[in-house]
Structure formats: C-alpha cells, structure tokens
Amino acid sequence: MEHHEDNAQLDNYLQNRLAESLQICGGAGEHNPHLADATGGNGCAPGIAPSKSDEVDGEEDEEWKYIHEVRQSEKLQQEKLPLTKETGNGFGPGRDSDNQVHGNGAAAVFNLYEEDVEVIKNDGDFSTNSNTTTSTDEVVARQAQEPNQLPEQLQQQQQIESQGVHEDPRQEDEDEHSSVATTYGTSSLSENNSSPLDQEEVVMVAQTVGQEQLVDFDNKENSYFVKNLEENHSQLNPNAVAFVPGVGSQSSSPLPAAEDPLPGVQPRPFLPGGTLDDLVAESPRKEFARINMDGIAVPDEREFDIEADMRPHELEQESDTFGAGHLEMQLLNGIGTADQAALRDVLDHGPETSVDMELPLDQVPNDADIMKQSIYAEHNSSIEDILNSVQPLPIQTCDDKELIHVEEKEHVSKSPSTEELQFQSDFPNNQESHTLFNNTEQDPMQASFYLEHTSQKAQEGCQEQMQLPAECSDIFADQSLLLDTSAPQLSSEADSPVAKLELESQQAGIVDITPSPLSSTAEKHLVEDTKELVEEYTLDPESHFFGVVSSQAPLQLFGKHTLPSIIHSCKHRVASEQNDEENAVFESVSGYETQNFDEISSPPEGINPFAQPFTPAHLVIEQANTMMEDVGGMPIPASEDFAICDKVASKSSNEVEDHRSEQQAFVKEELLHPVGDVVAQVENLGTEKNFVVEEERLPISVSDEIPLSSASKEKLLPDTTDEQLLTSALEEKLRSVAPEESVSTAADGQSISQFDEYVIASNKPLEDILEPEKDVEVAKSLSEKTSVATVAGGAVVGATKTHSATKAGSTAASAKSKTETLVMKKTTASSTSVYGANKSAAPRPSTARLGIKSTSIATKTSTTSSLTGNPRKSLSSNVGSTVKPPTKLSGTRPATAPVSKVTLGAKTITNKPTASGTASDNVTRTTLRPLVSTNARRPATSGTGSVASSTARRPVTNAKGSAPGSAASTKVRPAATMTAPVKPKVLSPRSTISSTTTVRKVPSTSTPSFSTRSPNKQQSNGLGKNTSSTTTSTATATITKSFTARSAPKFTHSASLTYNNGSTSRRLLVPGSSSTTTTSSLRKSSPLKAAPGKAASKPLTPQSKDGTAKSSPAVLKARNSTLMGGEGVAPSNECVPTPNGQINAEEVVKLKGKGLAEEVKIIEEQKLHEQDVPAHNAEVPLLDF
C-alpha cells in the first residue's frame, strides 16, 4: 500500500508533468530514441510508435497525459511493487513482461505473451483514450522488443521513480515509442499497468486513433489472455479506462489484486468525472448515461412551463401530474378521462420518452394504441372487477363461515356438539336414508343438522299436526338466540320435532350446535305434549308392548310415530343394528339422533348392557325382552307412568315450561360446554322438566314410552338415544320399582319434600334393580372409560359419558325423570333452596344439551342417584355440613368420585337415594359439582379425579350451604374453585385423579379414601359410593340434565360439559387449589359459563379460595338458585358451567334479552332440582374428570 500511496502521489505529479511534457513534446519521436535506448532494442516499436505518434500527437497529447500518468503510476507500481506488478490493469495478462516476471513473478510462459498483452494493454489504455495506437504489427514488434525491454523498462521505471518529473519527457517518448508494445488492452486499466514508464511513454507517443483501434483489437487478444488472468479486469477496464483517471478508482476498477488500485486510481482522476471511484464503481456505460443525462439540456422552469403550455396534453394532463394521475392511469388504464395521455405518459417515462412523447402526444388522440390502452385497460378493468368482487367474497364467505363455525365451536366445541356435528355430517346420508325409510319424522335428519330448517318446516307441520304446538316455533325463536352456535338448527322447526321424540332425538345429534333451542322447544312441547304424549301414550302401550322398543317408541309416538312407524323403526333399528349399532340406533331412534347417538354409540358399546340399550334396536328388542322378563307387564306401568305423566304434566306443565325456559337459557349457556349430550339436554332441560314430570312415571317403566318421551326429549338433542336406551333399560328395572316410582312421582308432583323422599325411595329400588346391571356396566364402562380416558380427556369424557350416559341414561333417565319431577315440584314448592337447586339442575341440563353423551350420563347419574340414594343420604348429611365432604375431598373427590363411579355403575344408584334423602338442597348443591365431575371427570380421570372433583364441590355445598338457595349458591363458586383441582381428572383419566384428589384433599379432607377412586373404578368400588353418595344424593336428578350434557364431552375434560351447573363453577373455583392444572383450567372455563348468574360467579370465586368452600355443584347451584330466584338469569349463569367458565355467564346475559328470564327461572328451578339430586351431581364429577 505504501507503494500504492507513493505511486498515487507520483502519479499525480507525473500526470501534471506528463500533461505538460506531452504538450511540450508534441512529437513523441524525440522521446522515441530514448525509449529505444531504454528499451534496448525496441527500435522497431519506436519506429512504429513515432510514426503513429507523429500522426496524432495533438490527439495523443490529451490522451497521452492520461496514458502517461497511468503508465507512471504503473511504473511506480512496478518498480516499488515489483511483486504487486500491476495490481490494476497491469495485474492482468502480463502487462509488462518485466512486471510479470518481476512483480508477479509470472511464469516465463507469460512473458512473451504478456509483452504482447502489454502492448495491447498500452494500446488498450490509449484506446480507452480513443487512441488507436498499436496495430498487430506493433504488437509483434513490441513482443520482440519487450524481452529486451523488460530489464530496461525496470531501469527506466526506477529512473522515473528517482527522477520523477525529469523522466517525463523520456517517459513520454518511451511511452510513445513503446505504445505499440505497451498498447496491450490491460493498459486500458492503466491504473494498475505495471508496464515500465518507457513502455507506457512509447505506447502513448505511438498511439494514434487508428492505433487505439488496433489496440482495441489487441485488447481482444488481451482479452483472450486476460481470460487466463487479467483479461476479466482488462475487459472491464477498456470501458473503465475512461474512468481510470479517478485516483481512487482502484476499488471501482475490477482489480483481481488490490496491489495497483492506487496507481490505477491516480490516472482516473483525469477522467472528466474527477475522482472516478464512483464512476468506476458504476459501469462506464452508466457513466455515459450520466453524461447523457448531463448532456440532456434541462430547460428552465419558465421555459419548461412555456413548452408545457405548448403541449398541454403532455404536460398539463400527464407530465404535470406525472406521478399521480398517470400512475392511476397506468394501474387502472382507461379508468380516468386522461387515460389516453396517461397511457402514453406511462409508456414514455423519462427524458427520452418525454421527447418521444411529443410525437405520440400529437397522436394522443390515438387511444387505439393497442399496446397502451386496450390491453391494459381491458385487463385492468376486468382484473379490478374480479379482484374487487371476488377477493372480498371469499374473504367474507370465509369470515362468515369461520365466525359461524367459531361460534359453534365456542358454544359447541366445549361440548361434544362439534364432534357430533361431524358425526352428523358423517351420518346425514344415513339419517336421510332413515328418513326415507322411517317417514318424515326423520326428515330433519334428511335436511341434515345444518338445517332442520328445510326439513323442519315440513316436520314442523307434521309436529303441529301431531303434538307440537305452534308454540314450538316461538319457543324455538327464543331459543335460537340461546343457541349462538347454529341458529338454523335453533329454528323452532328443529324444535318442533320435539313432538317426534325420535326426530328430536335424531335432531338432537343434528342440533348439537343448537342444543338449547331444540331442547327448550322440545321441553315446552314435552310439557305441553306430555299430556298429548300421555294421551298418545295410550297408543304407546302397543308400541310400549315392545318394552325397550317402547323406550324409543314413545319418542316415535311423541314424534307422531304410530305404532307401525315405531315397529318399522324398531325393525329398521334391528336391521341397522345388525349392520351397525350406531347407525341402527341413529336410524331407529332418530335420523338426527343418529349423529349424536353415533357419537354416543361407540362408547355405549363399551358399556355392553347399555351399549345394546344405546342402540335402539337392541334396546327395543333386548330390553323389551329383558323388561318383559324382569318387569313382566311393565308396559302397563308405562301406561301408569303416562297417567302419572298426565297428572304431573297437567300439574307441572306450567312449571315445566318455566323450567324449560330457565333450562333453555341455561342450556343455551351451556350449549357451548357439553357436546353431544348437552345439545340433547338443551331440549332435555325442558324435556327433563317434562322429564321430571315424565320421570315420575319414567322410573315406573323406562322402557315404556314415557322413558322414551322423557329420554327422547332429553335426547331430542344427540343424547336422546342414550337416555332412551338407558332409560328404557334402567326403567325396565325401574318398572319393578315402578309402583314405588309412580308413587314418588305422584307425591313429588304434589310436594318437593315428598319428591325428594320418593326419589330416594325410588332411587333405592333403582339401585337395587340397576346396581347389578350397573356393576356389569361399571366394569365395561370403567374399562371403556379407562381406555377412553386414556385416549383423550375430553374424548374419554364423551365416550365414558356415553357409556355412563347409556347406563345411567336409562337409569338416570328414569331417575332423572323422577328427580326432575321432584326438582320441578321443589321448584313448585317455591323453596328458595329448592329453587336454587333447580337452577343448578337447569345448568346441568344445559350442559347435558351441549353434550348429548353428558345427557346420557346424566340419565345414568339419575339412575345412580336412585341406587345410591341411601349412601348419598349419609353424604347428604355431610352435605348439610359442607365441610365434611370437603374433608372427604382430602381424598380428593372421594365422595364425589364414588358418586360418579356409582353413576357409571350400580353405585351411582346407591348414591342417589342417599343424596336425595339426605338433603335435597345440600345435595343439590353437592350434586352440581358431582354432576359435572361425574360426567367429565369420570371419563377423563379414571375415577379418582372425578370423584375428588365431585367431592370437593359437594363438601363445599355441604359446608357452605346448609341453606341450598343462598348459602349453597355462594358456596357453589368456591366449590368450583375447589373443584378446579378435580379437572386434572380429565387430564389423567385414572392417574391424574390421585393428584386431583390430593388437591381436593386440601379443600376437604373428609373423603381422602376416594382420592384414588377413578370415576369408573369407584362405581364398581363401594369406596366412592358411601362417601360421595351423600354428597351427590340430591345432585342425581340434576345430573340427569347436566350429566347428559356433560356425558358427551368429547373433550378429554368433561369439565366444561360437567360444569353445566354449579359443578362446573366449583371446578372453576377449584383450579387454584387443584393440583392438576388441566382439569382446573377446564373447570375454570366452564364455571364461568356454568355460572349463569353473575352472583354465582362472585360467590363461587371467593369460596373456591375457601378450602372447605368446595361445595358440591349442588351448593353452587343452590346459591345460584338463590340468585336465580331473585334474578332468574344470574343463577343460570352460575349453574351453566361451560368449558369456558366465562362464556356461560355471558350467554345467560344474552339469553336474558330473548326471554331467557323465563328459561333462567326454569334453569333456577332445575338448579334446585339438581341440588335436590346431589347424587347425580356427585357422580357427575367422576364422569366429568
């Protein structure tokens, strides 16, 4: 670099001196002798060079200055940097054979060729200066001379370095003389030319314009050589030579070596550009472009304006607004009035185009320019239309669909309904085929769940003709608001199939997204139609003659199924069942129910006793035979049940309708939470109100069409099939208890307390009847639930609930009908506690609606409550002291979990009587949590977690709410918080339970033994039975609703589904204390939803902090009931636990606006009922998680 710097300085001096010397020398001839001497035998070249130099000295003087300076720099570089040897141009193909030999140490091979190259270089330099100095002849001479010149050139270079300016004349002559030899194109990169000054001078002297041209030719030769090394640089350099004058142009010139950049840079400053670093960096053509730009005369503003005025079409229209208007024209082409001009301007941008623009501007009227306008304008306009219209459409469509689906998911995905929807989409063809086979009753299925609007209209007409009053559409309209997920499914028409219980059941699967509207309408219709159904039920005994068939036959009868249609459906069910149990169930029970039922059906298969009951065909046939064997002439009890239902319907049809509105709102709130069963329970809320009315008769004979009516009403949503089958199977056994049940139902219709007692009493018979079956079912359901729980927390909940729902569906269907009748009567009793319990029950139904499977489980839970009623009485007493069940919670839901297990197995039945008998209010509060726990937990957590969840809530209920209405409601949320730990049950179906149990142990240590109890295991185990039975005794009836909703939680965590009522709220509260986060999270989300009432949310959270505050869902619902009693909606929110605890409260508010107050009242009553049925709730926690 020092050499480069020195060379740069010397080059500056030399450039100035050489410019003067060249001018003075005029002729290179004088110097040529010196060059010849210096070259030592360059005589030929000097002779050639002088002649050429003489020819064009004037021209060369200018070029010579540049070339000489370049060569001086090269010489300096060569001498000082022999190794660097022409880093710039000289670095190329042997610029100076000397330099290559010396500096670069280039192989001798290059020396001769390099000499030629050097000649060419020098010529290139000159040529760049427009000096055609060297010819091929000169190059040849130079080649001959260079071998001798190399040492002389080195000497000359050294002398030049020492003499500096004094050498200039000699150098000039030498350069001129050697110009032929040195004209090698690399000299064009003279910056780096390492050729001796003598050679450079000779070349410069000799270079003429013609010579430069020849040099260019030589440069081509050099280019060939450069291809070896430097030609790439020299090739660039020939153009760069113009820029070479830039002193700092080294970097700009492509120098393979950085050795000569400075010398190359020095010559470049001579370029007009001054320092050519920038110019050199740019391509020489660019510089020419700059020159052209500079050459372009820019008119003054005034002149330009004048010119513009002369061409208004160009400038005013186009040029003046060149950027804006023209751009628009360019983009839009033909959009603007000045489109033609704009097109022209667009085509002609820049000074050249502007120049050309004048002519085209005259031709501007030629809009016919196909290139400019027609093509662009047409394409652009069409594209714009397409883009503007098409893009927004897909986006909007996607957004709308996404919003719809998102809402559906928000509401339904929390429950099995989304999966059920998938099932519906999978089974709609089957459903349609069933509809073709089964009559218009299945038309809603034909229409597909998306719409039961189209088919529902026809169905609506049929239903109106048959049993459903026009009120269905009105109710449905109210419910459609409740059902945010699928408004179309919410259509009253969809609900109108409620009269067609099978259609409702089938539709239940379809309406999973819209569980509450269908269920609400179905409930009202069930209430109103209960009498009609009972009246038609006289027809049912024929269909009821089929026993189990009657279980779903009542649905058909209710759905205007005549005995032939029922028989046909039964046959179809049998055939389909033979083909596919799920398909058969869907077909026979209801095309719509098929989807939800399919969802439920696979889990029911796990519960073999109920798996067949789940499949309507098996239920109809097998249970018909079984019931005929077990119950004997139970079809008569079915008619008795219908008579009871008539009484109850007449008595509580208003109450039931109120409960329905309440439950509908609650269900709609919980629509989001449970999936399959919840949807069914949307109807089931109302249906369960009727179901309470009907279940009074239902327990008498589930297989009777009463169970089907109540079950299908519950199942009008997807859960119908499970509950119908379960209800029929369980109620067949219940029919043995039927007298008892009828009495209890009648008494319950009359008084709430009697209803509780009857529920307990009836539940005991249920327990007795169902316990063996439940034990078997528990084994299957436990195995299934265990596997299902292992498979997925939510899926397990759904599957387990499906099985549980199937088992408990029948049992709980009857029990629920009993319990719910009781609940309704409690509500009628207008007890605040009972009303709160009913509200709790209502949220559960909402959950049940959301999850059809949950509904089935709820039904199962109801049955379980009946069976476990006595044990639950002890828990019920514990519920009276909420702390005690929480103490059991130290076992982490032991009390609740056993109930859940009991729900899965016969134990549930055992728990139910106890809970019912013990304290309907406390039990109801307790039940709310167990309900959720049993539904979601039991499937999700093998038993321990769900039990803990249930226990935690129930203890809270017991501890918090001796007064089920207010205290229970306040405690409900703490229970939910306490219950949150239960959520882990869903996370780990079996294993999580222990951790969950541990968490629950913290809230309540009273049930530590049940901590290990898995929801399924505990059913078989008596462990959860006794401890949790008391807690869940009252909850059992409520569980029928919410559990049905929660039964289908496809989510691994049924927590959201289970949270339908206070139970979910409790879980929400539990999460803080919960050892398992996932379950807690699920509960958290569901409790908010589960808390339809705002008050419920506030009380729940504070009490969740209370370790013992984990009141069972019943407690939460009891408090909610109190709130609900004051404000129907508030308890509903609390009672409606959803996967998102927050959503339910919001939904309740939404429901309020659309006449939800009524539904809220119903929900409150149901909460009271649920509180009255703690056994189911206690069981539900196991099912939940």
UniProtKB/Swiss-Prot annotation:
Composition bias type Low complexity, residue spans: 146-159, 856-866, 940-952, 1003-1015
Descriptive protein name: 205 kDa microtubule-associated protein
Region (Disordered): 146-196, 856-1035, 1054-1114
Keywords, in A-Z order: Cytoplasm, Cytoskeleton, Microtubule, Phosphoprotein
Bias (Polar residues): 179-196, 867-881, 908-936, 989-999, 1016-1026, 1054-1066, 1100-1111
Role, per record: May play an important role in the regulation of microtubule assembly and interaction.
Other facts noted in the record for this chain: Phosphorylation of various serine residues may play a regulatory role. The basic domain contains numerous sequences that match known consensus sequences of several different protein kinases.
Biological source species: Drosophila melanogaster
Transcription regulation found in the keyword field: no
Modification sites for Phosphotyrosine: 450
Major subcellular site: cytoplasm
Superkingdom of this protein's organism: Eukaryota
Disulfide bonds: none
Modified residues (Phosphoserine): 354, 448, 709-710, 712, 728, 874, 1075, 1086, 1121
Record's subcellular location: Cytoplasm, Cytoskeleton; Cytoplasm, Cytoskeleton, Spindle
An example Gene Ontology CC term for this record: microtubule associated complex
Residue numbers spanned by region Microtubule-binding: 745-977
